[in-house]
Every structure is written in C-alpha cells, then in structure tokens.
Amino acid sequence: SYSMEHFRWGKPVGKKRRPVKVYPNGAENESAEAFPVEV
C-alpha cells in the first residue's frame, strides 16, 4: 500500500491520515483510502 500511495501521491498520506473534513459527503471512510488530502 505504501508503494502505491507513494507512487501516486508522492507521500503515504492515504493510510497515515484520514481527511474527514475533505469529505463532507460522509464517504470519508472509503474515499480516504483512494483519495487522500492531496485530492
């Protein structure tokens, strides 16, 4: 997972931090995995 996130986002923020505030739609629990704070 680390390699994948580090490759796509440049830093493993996907698993490290859950940007709940970035997902006001309430889908943060699964969106945070695929779409980190970078998006």
From Swiss-Prot:
SMART domains xrefs: ACTH_domain
List of residues that carry Valine amide: 13
Tissue and organ expression note: Expressed in the pituitary gland.
CC annotations in GO: extracellular space; secretory granule
Molecular-function GO terms, alphabetical: G protein-coupled receptor binding; hormone activity
UniProt entry keywords in alphabetical sequence: Acetylation, Amidation, Cleavage on pair of basic residues, Hormone, Phosphoprotein, Secreted
Family: Belongs to the POMC family.
Localization (cell): Secreted
Family annotation (InterPro entries): Mcrtin_ACTH_cent, PMOC, POMC-derived_peptides
Summary of the function given for this chain in its UniProt record: Precursor protein for pituitary hormones that regulate stress and environmental adaptation.
Organism annotation: Oryctolagus cuniculus (Rabbit)
A Pfam family hit: ACTH_domain
Tree of life domain: Eukaryota
UniProt keyword S-adenosyl-L-methionine, yes or no: no
Miscellaneous notes: Residues 16-17 were deduced from the amino acid composition and by homology with other mammalian corticotropins.
One GO biological process term: regulation of corticosterone secretion
Descriptive protein name: Pro-opiomelanocortin
List of residues that carry Phosphoserine: 31
Name of the coding gene: POMC
N-acetylserine modified-residue sites: 1
Tagged with keyword Acetylation: yes
